[in-house]
Regions:
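Histidine-centered catalytic/metal-binding microenvironments
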Residues: 1-42, 173-277, 547-659, 938-939, ...
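Short beta-strands within extracellular/lumenal beta-sheet-rich domains
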Residues: 61-81
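Aromatic-lined ligand-binding clefts that engage carbohydrates, nucleic acids, or primary amines
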Residues: 83-111, 633-635
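Beta-strand-rich ligand-recognition modules
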Residues: 102-164
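The substrate-binding groove and active-site-proximal loops of carbohydrate-active enzymes
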Residues: 124, 230-239, 269-285, 308-317, ...
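Catalytic alpha-helical scaffold of carbohydrate-active enzymes acting on polysaccharides/glycoconjugates
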Residues: 249-264, 288-300, 316-374, 388-396, ...
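C-terminal (or distal) subdomains of carbohydrate-active enzymes
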Residues: 390-396, 409, 418, 434, ...
Length: 1014
């Protein structure tokens, strides 16, 4: 017999789409619909239900961009519906859904008339099974339906991910016209056997598409599908579905092979805390998703769902307390699993060390206190690369495991492992898994399962991987169709063997199976999204400033509490921290969200700054009294201008050398006795002479403090990406409009395009340091502004500050891994050097850098450090970065790594001038005598006990020994984890009263808790 497999497959697909799918509902019944449009921002159910609803016709338009319409659906279930076990009564809703991804368009949430949330309706989850809810729209067993649907008219900002500029990301420019038409709001009588038949078709057709064309198993499946289609009557699918299913049952009953890859399927919904929607919409997305999950758990007791981000649970508790209690019950039963340990799924490249610590402190404390769960994993599937400081921080918070899949997005290199141990800068290792399915939004279809098995790098050693399944990014979560797929692939020949699982079960099993995996040392650099280090500079500046204000506020508040007995503002500090932690979400701090999000972030940072300045002012008054004497407070970990670290005084040291600025024919000469700098008439630095080392720092013929403008047109992902080809087009900004001496500094102004730059250049007193303040009125589009410092230093690597230390990165391009790091991230400083000489470049708000090698007349290698100051991407915010910006940069010559550390703190924590009583000083609450041991935080304990908590780290990459002294009465000193729980000492050698001797490994992070004497 002539048999054409491809024709059979086409026949099966058409039969499924044209006959089976339409037959899943035997019949439908209309409902009466009325509607009320919310005038402005969303309201809660009680306000909506009390409003005046107007009759609404199915087919009519609704929903201005970002608007909300409440629909009220009433009616009765027809007699005889749902009378047998093969049918179910459902509410079926189509809000005008498009082909866009769920979570990127209209969404709805269904309530009973009493205000109980039932579940969400979304493009691929449109039905509400009324029969599964006690009183789900009915009361006292009646057949009446009375339901409300809160419909969100969220615009599809992403479109087809074509990255075109759009006004939809700003509520003020998004327009007023309706976006959607209500296509369907009615009752449907679900034919359960037909629906099950549809799931059989999906499983088997998907499987055969993944099998080799010449495989026996594929041929068997094709024949069985062909027979099933023959056996069913296309005019009576309901009546013949059982026959078709009986034929397909034999294909589905063939068990998986003993060597089949084992998939731990974990329900999940990646919900971006903001991205192409504002934070306020995320709050509703969380409620919609979590209600879906609770509904699914009620009907599938084996289903396990994992959700990260304590912030999202906190929103649920605040705005949807009844739903939060339902989630709490599911957590107690083990079906709903909090994961991730963090307040949000944070970026990990740019947050400072203490901020990353607080992500874990805030997240883990919430999960422990509210849900009784001590989370043990770091769950960051979508962040844009992972700092080498993260393993130590995670382990210090009690985390054992780490999961991401984002490195699968690498443009150049493929990570060699999926299961391994990841080692951080201090040597801490954490068991790590990259799901080889390469997505956190799996549908558990055959294509995803086959990809997981095909790409799994540990074949022959390991046998298992984790697959997160459920609609995500904009939420939604798993569906009943996905659970049906899991059921059919539990043991199915030709497919990996799927089991519903949890992250904990997977990691325990993977560790047991693979106790000695390979080790990856250092950062997990993402070869993609490099522009995220620079986009939305105001958001990044707000983050950096907030982090350092928080340090100051906690330090001075703790000092005032201990010394002056004032109340510690724990509540205000917690609010400030939680606000900052939210802004560190991996689409906010990286600058990759819509305009609405970044405008809101700026307002949040301003509010945080106001609150923290008030705390600092109140603390200073308590410590210094009310007077007119200027007092300088130094929150930095090392002395500045004679002001002690973590202390204050009204007397600063007098500069020992003269600081001169003279105009010459060729330009200007600045000299402070440490450095002599020559600047030409164009405002470019032509010479920096280190007088102590008798060494020239600027290569012959080069110019430092050179602003360079690049065309910045990435191939895709505008705000996210800087592509390597940007380097091919560059304009050196050398035209100067104004250059003059004023206030012992050189001031210069340049104009280019529609923009203007004003710089102030000066030498620091008594230090070989140049300070440059750059103010930009930025009105470019798709341009990248960099600030270049060519240096006469021979280096093959550069040190960049990260959390609690620094990493060395090659600056040559010997390998594809080296070449791919053409843009890197640093915190407060970078350092390049030879064995006995170096230069540090520090900043107060910049993260993106590129550091390259050059040559002087082809003979000697030089090094160029460039800071990425500003970008101007067009998507998702077409006005990103437009307006005013200020950046401070310093260049210290003859710098060691310790010098770089001090310089980074100096630039970010300048001396603070306050007023107090003459002669008043603020003695440091804590002192440390080891130069390499840096105090990162001084605060009171989270538990309200009044204990003083001090966080320290070794900053130079060396072994360090030093004494930490509490300058107040102490009963005991203990070493704790990051959650301030006592642990066995790893660094404490001995304690003598208030003094503790520490021995630290390179980059070791330590938390000490001082119990105060009454």
């Amino acid at each position: 017999m002539l048999y054409n497999s491809s024709l059979v497959e086409a026949r099966v697909r058409r039969f499924r789409s044209e006959r089976v799918v339409p037959a899943t509902y035997r019949t439908t019944s209309p409902l009466a619909v009325s509607a009320w449009e919310v005038p402005d921002e969303p309201v809660m159910f009680a306000d909506a239900a009390a409003s005046r609803f107007q009759p609404f016709q199915v087919g009519a338009p609704w929903g201005r961009p970002w608007g909300t319409v409440w629909f009220h659906a009433t009616g009765a279930v027809p007699d005889g519906w749902g009378a047998d076990s093969d049918t179910g009564v459902e509410l079926v809703v189509d809000l005008g859904f498009t082909h866009a991804q769920p979570g990127f368009q209209a969404e709805g949430m269904v309530y009973t008339a009493s205000g109980r949330i039932l579940k969400a309706v979304e493009p691929l989850n449109r039905a509400l099974p009324l029969s599964f809810h006690s009183g789900g729209g009915a009361s006292d067993g009646a057949r009446l339906v009375d339901l409300y649907i809160e419909a969100a008219a969220n615009p599809n900002v992403a479109q087809e991910m074509d990255f075109f500029p759009t006004p939809l990301g700003d509520k003020t420019t998004a327009g007023e016209g309706p976006l959607y038409r209500l296509r369907r709001l009615e009752l449907g009588l679900l034919d359960i056997p037909v629906w099950q038949l549809e799931q059989d078709f999906v499983a088997l057709v998907g499987l055969l598409e993944q099998l080799p064309a010449d495989s026996q198993r594929r041929a068997e499946i094709v024949h069985m599908l062909d027979r099933a289609v023959d056996a069913m009557d296309p005019e009576d699918i309901a009546g013949t579905a059982a026959v078709g299913r009986s034929i397909l049952a034999s294909a589905l009953a063939r068990p998986a092979s003993a060597s089949a890859h084992r998939v731990h399927a974990v329900g999940h919904a990646h919900i971006d805390s903001a991205w192409l929607w504002p934070v306020r919409e995320t709050v509703r997305k969380v409620a919609r998703t979590f209600s879906n999950v609770c509904d699914l758990i009620d009907r599938n007791p084996d289903f396990v769902f994992a959700a990260s981000s304590a912030q999202q649970y906190a929103w649920l508790k605040e705005f949807y307390p009844d739903l939060f209690e339902r989630v709490r019950d599911k957590v107690a039963s083990g079906n709903f699993v909090p994961v991730g340990s963090m307040w949000v799924e944070s970026d990990t490249n740019m947050p400072g060390g203490e901020a990353l610590v607080r992500q874990f402190v805030a997240g883990k404390r919430f999960f422990l206190e509210e849900l009784g769960v001590d989370t043990q994993e770091v769950w960051l599937p979508d962040s844009f690369g992972y700092s080498a400081g993260l393993p130590q921080i995670a382990a210090g918070a009690g985390a054992r495991w780490f999961l991401t899949q984002k490195t699968s997005w690498n443009e150049t290199n493929v990570m060699p492992h999926h299961t391994f141990r990841w080692e951080g800068i201090d040597g801490t290792q954490i068991f790590t898994h990259f799901p080889p399915v390469d997505t956190y939004n799996s549908d558990l279809g055959a294509a995803d399962l086959a990809r997981a098995e095909r790409q799994y790098a540990e074949k022959g050693i390991g046998t298992m991987s984790l697959v997160p399944f459920g609609h995500g990014d904009g939420g939604g979560g798993p569906t009943r169709e996905m659970l049906a797929a899991a059921e059919r692939t539990r043991s199915l020949e030709g497919s990996p063997a799927v089991s519903l699982s949890s992250p904990h079960r997977f990691f325990k099993a993977a560790e047991a199976e693979y106790p000695h995996p390979p080790v990856w040392s250092g950062e997990l650099y993402l070869e993609f999204h490099r522009g995220a280090y620079t986009s939305q500079a105001r958001t990044k500046r707000g983050n950096r400033r907030s982090e350092h204000l928080l340090r100051e506020a906690e330090l001075w508040a703790a000092t005032a509490t201990v010394r002056a007995g004032v109340d510690y503002p724990a509540g205000a500090l917690q609010d400030a921290w939680r606000t900052v932690l939210l802004q560190q979400f991996h689409d906010i701090l990286p600058g990759t969200s819509i305009a609405w999000v970044h405008q809101e972030a700026e307002r949040n940072y301003a509010r945080v700054a106001e609150s923290l300045e008030q705390i600092i002012d109140t603390s200073a008054r308590a410590l210094l009294g009310r007077g007119d004497r200027k007092v300088l407070l130094n929150a930095a970990p090392s002395a500045q201008d004679g002001i002690p670290a973590l202390g204050g005084s009204d007397t600063r040291s007098t500069p020992t050398g003269a600081n001169s600025l003279r105009e010459r024919d060729a330009g200007f000469v600045l000299d402070n006795g440490k450095v002599r700098m020559s600047i030409d008439r164009a405002g470019l630095i032509r010479s920096i002479r280190d007088l102590g080392a008798d060494r020239e720092v600027v290569p012959h013929g080069a110019a430092a403090n050179l602003l360079q403008l690049h065309r910045d047109t990435p191939t895709q992902w505008d705000a996210w990406d800087i592509d390597e080809h940007y380097r091919r087009t560059v304009t050196d900004l050398t035209d100067v409009e104004i250059i003059e001496i004023a206030d012992d500094a050189l001031h210069l102004t340049r104009r280019f395009g529609a923009s203007r730059v004003t710089q102030t250049v000066r030498l620091a007193d008594d230090a070989p340091t140049i300070d440059i303040r750059t103010e930009v009125e930025w009105h470019e589009r798709q341009k990248l502004l960099k600030l270049a410092f060519p240096l006469d230093v021979h280096a093959d690597r550069a040190a960049s500050e990260i959390q609690f230390g620094h990493v060395y990165r090659p600056i040559h391009t010997n390998t594809s891994w080296d070449a791919a790091r053409f843009e890197t991230v640093a915190h407060r400083w970078v350092h390049v050097g030879e064995s006995n000489y170096g230069v540090a470049v520090a900043n107060d708000s910049t993260y993106g850098h590129d550091i390259t090698r050059g040559h002087t007349q082809g003979r000697a290698s030089t090094t160029t450090v460039r800071l990425s100051l500003l970008r101007a991407p067009l998507f998702p915010d077409p006005r990103a970065d437009q307006g005013s910006h200020t950046m401070n940069v310093s260049l210290r010559v003859g710098a060691t790594i310790p010098d770089a550390v001090r310089e980074g703190y100096r630039v970010n924590l300048p001396l603070r001038t306050v007023r107090g009583v003459e002669g008043t000083e603020v003695g440091p609450l804590i002192t440390v005598d080891g130069q390499a041991i840096v105090i990162e935080a001084v605060k009171l304990a989270e538990d309200g006990s009044g204990d003083v908590v001090v966080r320290l780290y070794e900053a130079h990459g060396t072994r360090a020994r030093g004494r930490v002294t509490a300058n107040f009465g102490v009963l005991a000193v203990t070493e704790t984890d990051l959650l301030e729980r006592e642990v066995s000492p790893t660094s404490m050698q001995n304690t003598d009263g208030p003094t503790t001797t520490l021995e630290l490994r390179p980059f070791q992070l330590v938390t000490l808790r001082f119990t105060r004497a009454e």
